[in-house]
Amino acid sequence: MKYFILSLGCTKNQADSEVIMGILESKGYVRSLNPEESDLLIVNTCGFIAAAIEESIEEILNLVHLKKPGQKILVAGCLVQREGKELAKHLPEVDLFFTPREINNLDKLLADLGENNKLVLSEPGFLNLEKKPRAKSNEVYRYIKIADGCDNRCTYCTIPAIRGKYTSRPLDDILEEIKDTLKQGIKEIILVAQDTTAYGIDLYGEFKLVELLRKIGSIKGNFWVRLMYLYPDKITPELINEIKENPKVIKYVDVPLQHIHPEILKKMGRKGSSEEIISTLERLRKEIPDITIRTTFIVGFPGETEEQFNYLLDFVKKFKFNRLGAFPYYREKGTPAAKMKGQIPKKVKEQRYEKLMEVQQEISLNLNKALVGKKIPVIVEKKIRGENLYLGRTYMDAPEIDGIIEIKAEKRLKKGQIINVLITDYDIYDLKGEFIND
């Protein structure tokens, strides 16, 4: 028996998909990359924004079009949590819709898989507290979900409604999964949650990310720990010091800011003032000079004036983020922002997005140019054309969202090997370099 799975959306969804895969493989299923030869066709959907919903529905319809007698289609994930009843009504070809928490019951759902499509809904959120098996979809890195849900109430965001209240995993459970992951040969641990900095507050009554990092740091071995989704209002001096001093924690932080103008931040429901945010960012750079700071911005939020957008643009020019992503604002039903006055025309939002990314591209090009001649820690991902060329990522680059580096090496390199590379060439986002055998 074979299964085909397509995981859409965020890193947390990828972690959930690997649990689905692990359950299936424990039952004897073998993963296939070809849906036409598979018995089970699975889409783990994203329901965050309109574009993600459209992509999810398009992929479901693609599988419906391919479906042959005897094949079963399963649809999971956030879109089922958000729009399950509508999906089941309009897609009778799908055999099973189930929400993230129902991954715990996947064994039973598969056993009960009948001829008619079925919808199984539950409370939002999934943390695999039952320790279901997890498959390995990548040999180099793994996303470790330390919490699910969100208690922040950003006015544009649907996540609290889809994933539920913020729920942390027990610290020992996380450490156990990390140790098991390292035993499998994976060398990069990426800690993720909707708000990684809030870890532990619901479970222990206080923030526990620093303690978690210290305990991870005591695990033997040569591996990286990467931090994603840090909220600026919870980046404490203690956390900054731990990132600085812990040799396992690479000097990279993903800090989604969404905006910097005080009035827009207030309308977004973001915590912390512009001054506090800037102070935190400056402290990160002062304490850890070689740190890479990634952020994300939303342009075209309701009521955003040209002056407020230029305020954001000037800030980006001045601060020079190492990595930056941006999105035009999406009007999501059920959110306070969707009802706000001053909705920005699509064309204006797109123009602002293009303008921001043009500024960032110039910044990125200059930052990469400055790396030429320097030695940078790199993790090897795979071998490419020729006998001595490999692809990897510097510590400054997270998988899928940041750049890559082409490595020339006279000796054979292994996947997951952490090496020093001399930077020899660059473009806007990517680098080239030579392996230095120190």
Swiss-Prot record:
Main location: cytoplasm
Reactions performed catalytically: L-aspartate(89)-[ribosomal protein uS12]-hydrogen + (sulfur carrier)-SH + AH2 + 2 S-adenosyl-L-methionine = 3-methylsulfanyl-L-aspartate(89)-[ribosomal protein uS12]-hydrogen + (sulfur carrier)-H + 5'-deoxyadenosine + L-methionine + A + S-adenosyl-L-homocysteine + 2 H(+)
Keywords: 4Fe-4S, Cytoplasm, Iron, Iron-sulfur, Metal-binding, S-adenosyl-L-methionine, Transferase
Binding-site residues, [4Fe-4S] cluster 2: 150, 154, 157
Limits of the TRAM domain: 369-437
Keyword DNA damage: no
Single GO BP term: tRNA modification
Residue ranges annotated for the Radical SAM core domain, each copy included: 136-366
Classification via HAMAP family: MTTase_RimO
Cofactor(s) named in the record: [4Fe-4S] cluster
Protein family according to the UniProt entry: Belongs to the methylthiotransferase family. RimO subfamily.
Name recorded for this polypeptide: Ribosomal protein uS12 methylthiotransferase RimO
Cofactor comment: Binds 2 [4Fe-4S] clusters. One cluster is coordinated with 3 cysteines and an exchangeable S-adenosyl-L-methionine.
GO MF annotations in UniProt: 4 iron, 4 sulfur cluster binding; aspartic acid methylthiotransferase activity; metal ion binding; protein methylthiotransferase activity
InterPro entries (UniProt xref): Elp3/MiaA/NifB-like_rSAM, Methylthiotransferase, Methylthiotransferase_CS, Methylthiotransferase_N, Methylthiotransferase_N_sf, NA-bd_OB-fold, Ribosomal_uS12_MeSTrfase_RimO, rSAM
EC number(s) on file: 2.8.4.4
Family matches, as PANTHER family: RIBOSOMAL PROTEIN S12 METHYLTHIOTRANSFERASE RIMO, RIBOSOMAL PROTEIN US12 METHYLTHIOTRANSFERASE RIMO
Residues that hold [4Fe-4S] cluster 1 according to the record: 10, 46, 78
A single Gene Ontology CC term: cytosol
Name of the gene encoding the protein in the UniProt record: rimO
Keyword Transferase attached: yes
Pfam families, A to Z: Radical_SAM, TRAM_2, UPF0004
Function statement: Catalyzes the methylthiolation of an aspartic acid residue of ribosomal protein uS12.
Location(s) in or outside the cell: Cytoplasm
Every MTTase N-terminal domain range: 1-115
